[in-house]
């Protein structure tokens, strides 16, 4: 769902173009088609991930209007019209806060304003060392895999992560599995 903003972008071939409405229409159709074949689509990279150079350290500084009209539009369509089952966060920061750690983006915007009820997954390694902070922000699945189980359990035991939050994250993953198995 990324918007092609730089003609020299090395991954522009993965994007649907620079027009937010074209991206939105294409995203919704692609998600519907993929999911009609029993495959869970994963819309990525939420949000404003539009360059490869320094993408792990850069911040996309946006007004709320620009965020919603340009960068969130494709995700909105994938959610409303495509009923996408999974969304991947981006490496970059938005307005100084990394997306994988941002409650404003993952919980308030994505789940609250855009009404996404599927699974939110991190890009590979984007969660860094603060796994409980990522989960508390709204991330359901941290990639790469299962070597973080001990850290999550310890965070719950020490009160750094509530059991309620962890249960909510697991619920989203189980719901994703159930949806896939229905197909």
Q: Where in this protein do the model-derived segments appear?
A:
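Glycoside hydrolase catalytic-domain context in secreted enzymes
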Residues: 1-183
